[in-house]
């Protein structure tokens, strides 16, 4: 469950290390973001020489959440951290690598490029 002011790890090589959620996109009453939701975020920690700088406002897709959630088959899944991947136009990732596992729900939400770059899909 990601809401405004939540800080997330960035799981790609764009140079951002940590972002803070500003808004969960998808209507005026959307309160929480789940895996596969797009958020608007601010870069809080960045490495020098990266694509993004501290203070940049970016769009990102949530790939892992620490809060468990149920799947249609009755199973539950949760991750150790809250993580996101920065995206650009046409919802393609801005980085060329993705670190750590991603949730299977991204495939259903048509983030195929992220799924193909990920080392593991759970």
Swiss-Prot record:
GO biological process, one term: translation
InterPro entries in UniProt: Ribosomal_uL14, Ribosomal_uL14_bac-type, Ribosomal_uL14_CS, Ribosomal_uL14_sf
Tree of life domain: Bacteria
Pfam family, one: Ribosomal_L14
Keyword Ribonucleoprotein: yes
GO cellular component: cytosolic large ribosomal subunit
GO MF annotation list: large ribosomal subunit rRNA binding; structural constituent of ribosome
Transmembrane region(s): none
Entry keywords, A to Z: Ribonucleoprotein, Ribosomal protein, RNA-binding, rRNA-binding
Binding partners and assembly: Part of the 50S ribosomal subunit. Forms a cluster with proteins L3 and L19. In the 70S ribosome, L14 and L19 interact and together make contacts with the 16S rRNA in bridges B5 and B8.
Family, per entry: Belongs to the universal ribosomal protein uL14 family.
Functional description taken from the UniProt entry: Binds to 23S rRNA. Forms part of two intersubunit bridges in the 70S ribosome.
Listed name of the protein: Large ribosomal subunit protein uL14
Organism listed in the record: Chloroflexus aurantiacus (strain ATCC 29366 / DSM 635 / J-10-fl)
């Amino acid at each position: 469950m990601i809401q405004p002011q939540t800080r997330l790890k960035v799981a790609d090589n764009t140079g951002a290390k940590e972002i803070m959620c500003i808004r969960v996109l998808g209507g005026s009453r959307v309160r929480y973001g789940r895996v596969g939701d797009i958020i608007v975020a601010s870069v809080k920690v960045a490495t020098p020489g990266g694509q993004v700088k501290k203070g940049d406002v970016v769009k990102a897709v949530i790939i892992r959440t620490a809060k468990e959630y149920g799947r249609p088959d009755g199973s539950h899944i949760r991750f150790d951290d809250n993580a996101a991947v920065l995206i650009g136009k046409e919802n393609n990732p801005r980085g060329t690598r993705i670190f750590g596992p991603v949730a299977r729900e991204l495939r259903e939400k048509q983030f195929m490029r992220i799924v193909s770059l990920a080392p593991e899909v759970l």
